Amino acid sequence: MARRGIAKQVTLSLLLAILTVTFLYPLYFMLINSLKSRTEYFVNPFSLPRGALQFENYSTMISQFKILNLFKNSFFVSAGTVVLLLVVCVFASYVFAKYRFRGRTAIYLAVLTTMFIPSQVTIIPLYVLFSKMGLVNRYWSVILSYLALFLPEAILLMTANFRAIIDELLEAAEMDGCGYFQRVRHVVVPMGRAAIFLSIIFYFITAWNDLFTPMIFLQSMDKRTVMVALAALMGRYTGAPTLQFAGLLLSAVPALVVYIIFQRHIIRGLSVGAIK
Amino acid sequence: MKRLFTFSLLLVFLLASVAITLSSCGGKKEAVKLTVWMNGADSIIGPTEQQKPQDQWYVSQAFRRFEKANPGVTLELVVQADQGAAHTNFKTAGLAGNAPDVANLWTGQPIFALKEVILSLDKLVPADDLKYIVGWESVRDGFKPDGTILGYPAAQNQICHMLYNKAIVKKAGMDWEANPPRTIEEFDSALAKIKAIGVTPIVVDEAAQGVPWFFCWVADYWWTQMTTNDGILEETYGRKKFAEDKGFLATLAYYRSMYVKGFFRKDLTTANDSFTQFLNGKGALWPAVTSFLADAEKSLGADCGVLLPPEFDPNAKLVNSTVGGPGQSFVVAKNTKYPQMAVKLISFLNSKAEVLAAQKINRYPIVRTDVTPEEMGWVPGSNIAKLHKYSTTYNYWVDNLLTSGPAEIFYTQTSLVAVGKMTPLQLAEAMDKKAAAQ
Amino acid sequence: MTHTTRASLRDSAIGRKRTRIKRLEIFLSLLPVVLILLVFRVYPIVTALAKSFTNWDGLYRSDWVGLRNYVTFVQEGTFWMILRNTLILLLNVPLQVFIGIVVALLLYERVAGWRIYRAVIYTPQIISAVIIGFLFKIFFGFEGPFNAVLKAVGLGTLAIEWFGNSYTALGVIVFSIVWFSIGWQAIVILGGMSSIPPSVFEAAVIDGANYWQRAFRIVIPMLVRVLEFSIIASGVWTLTQLFPFLFAMTKGGPGYETSTLDYMIYLKSYGLGFGRDYGTATAVAMILLLLVLALTVIEMRLANRADDWG
């Protein structure tokens, strides 16, 4: 690494630094505006707050808007989706990656094809279907919708990753008497954990931030997710933007936490040798 | 054997008595539960309320009052995050048979399109309501005075106007409180005077909201002065042509000339900060509806004025008016189990007492003829009182007259005419093509 | 057991039982996936396909009209513009992949401050598209900061109305998508790099390869499968999930100049709350589906590496 030109290194570092600043700017924007009064925001959205800092936006969010309750709903949906997604995906991807059977390519491609369907189109038939199943306004409707949406992409990711697992490891495990579940537990999951952690990050955050699906399927006030509730704060004619920013900032926290916890593990796999 | 027999008899007795008690429970007055969808931000629930806990909102308290007056009834409030999507949701829920008993939707074509899943209220609306509430034409199918009643106009009214900055106008040598521009020529020269002192006359985000703001709030009035609402209806139903509508073409031509003369900001179709600019004195006028008055008055104080649109055609039958009216409605789903109770609730929300209570929180010109501005506590001559004068003489929202085909073109492409990317005739022809395909 | 070959295993009774167990494993592993997708994806899309040949208004009107929806839509003056927009926006994919690789390499090599960068790069993905769209719109607005900077450095002639014209608006949107996606690309690639044994790198160093040679000749070929994933996933995202961004930034405008097929589906089915045009909306969705399939097939053919999928 020392052999690379210092100039090159400095330029790259500088670019990364600039990039980092731009990445953080939206959070900064929401922060300064969440501390302003509504009229002050309309007058200048980019200045630092001039009047008294409106911490009430945050206290309102917690005590009166009951954002923690909304977190609970979002969490049930996001965590439920991720857990089920992992369970279904790991086994399916393992089979796609390491087993040979007739029709494997066909089924794999068929699964992938469902990825290409935009969700706006399936939402109405799904609503009618869930209505007949009595699942409207239950978490299951959103979880199942997300599962159907995320499965193909997650399988694509995990299969790509699992294929890199060295066959000899699996054979060795089988020779040692490991059954199917044990092979998954002792070989596939540890070796494929990059893809697993990536999936946890992607799909938890995608589900957490999604507006469209829960807006349609979870309408009762006590089951609304955070993003849906916050969207109701801005209409075409009126709105409470500063309050909304406080809420958005607060709801970014769990997503960031999930990311920070799991992203360390993705790179940790670097130094761990594969052949023990 | 005898024991067994006695035992069985006892058991049967027990079961019978339990069954009888249970069935008599069902005979008592059944609990009535109504689900109500409310617009989250643009209607009865205002921005200031969502800062309070839900049970302190005006609408929640109104519900409690209703429940108290009608024991056995519970109301479940559902806030719709996106009013546009609410219509599609209502439609889908209606298809599935579980649309909410009462829903707060828009008026006009949006609910006409849903009439297959909306309950007709012809036989259910009390006569007093028909008498004292304004705006029924907006909820009657086809806007006909005898059309099926599809809902109630919601208890508030938006009136279109232009907010203006008195200080800038004064600097340009005018006083619009004493002498507002009332003809299109006066308006034109007034804007030119403002431009002459170096201030952008009209700041507006013409496309940022997906709706051409200036055109919808102001120019639509000019259009309907010449063509009348009925004329526009004929065109949207395909019986007449937009391309032959002289009023429409003339309005569009003037709209384009306003841009050419520099009366609009240059980035008309891509801007999204016009309200901010207006509040900072960088623009003289900003087209608005009543909801924005409070924020504008807070920022500009005494410098905040309201200007009603000038007359494009002084010989028109429609004068001294502006676009507005009940843009929101309350509808009842066809699949409701309690139609009378649903109507009773809506009637309650529109009652004089409730309207007065609601207005304490959200100021709008109101839809009842038996409420005076004094009762509302509005100072005569104040901006809100000025707007209130139009609460019975408004001209119903022109863009809600359009059916979805022409509406799609109108909403997405009208702003292009201002910047010259499309000619008025091209816009009209595109709308005709859609109207014909319906 | 350890001395018998696979073939004899298969032939014996134990071998046949093994095969049966394996078949069961395959079946049960794939069953949940197939079921979920059939019920919640295939069934709705088949319904949608059927509806695309009708004049369905979302409610009870549903008369067969054959290919009319498709024909009308393709014949609308805006169809080719929309198609063009959709394809131009796809240019973001190679850009984000390239930058993503560079960033991933830098993080892998632990450039100064890498921990901070790694923690921060995913942030845009966590922020709602509405805020991102709003900020980009202001930033590149006619009177916004970007133009102000251009004027300040004397490039005033370039300070145009970025969102006012099709190509420049699309350019800004591509830029914003790349900005938004760098973090995602980088961690996907890092994830892929984590399964490359360090011995490969060590061997390369011994062989005397310098940094860039190591990076591009060795690492990238090993990442092919991961890159294939990220290219397909970002391509599909651009084609089917871009809607919130477009809505926040341009609303598909001016006019239809930045509308895509994905956006048109929204407009036709939800547009302003009373879209009656579900028949056309589903037809557009079918057209989009065909487009995506076509592009993916092309991509897979181009990336035809030797592996046992073919």
List each model region and its residues.
Chain B
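Conserved N-terminal structural module of periplasmic/extracytoplasmic solute-binding proteins
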Residues: 19-111, 115, 129, 176-177, ...
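Conserved C-terminal helix/tail region of periplasmic/extracytoplasmic solute-binding proteins
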Residues: 74, 78, 170, 355, ...
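Hinge/lid segment of periplasmic solute-binding proteins
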Residues: 81, 106-160, 215-216, 305-308
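A structural signal for short loop-to-beta-strand junctions that line the ligand-binding cleft
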Residues: 101, 130-169, 316-323, 393-400
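Short, solvent-exposed loop/beta-turn-alpha elements that line the ligand-binding surface or hinge
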Residues: 122-135, 179-180, 202, 223-250, ...
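Extracytoplasmic/periplasmic solute-binding protein
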Residues: 144-155, 160, 185-238, 283
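Glycine-centered hinge/linker elements that transmit conformational signals in sensory
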Residues: 188-193, 234-268
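Extracytoplasmic/periplasmic substrate-recognition and gating elements
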Residues: 261, 298-363
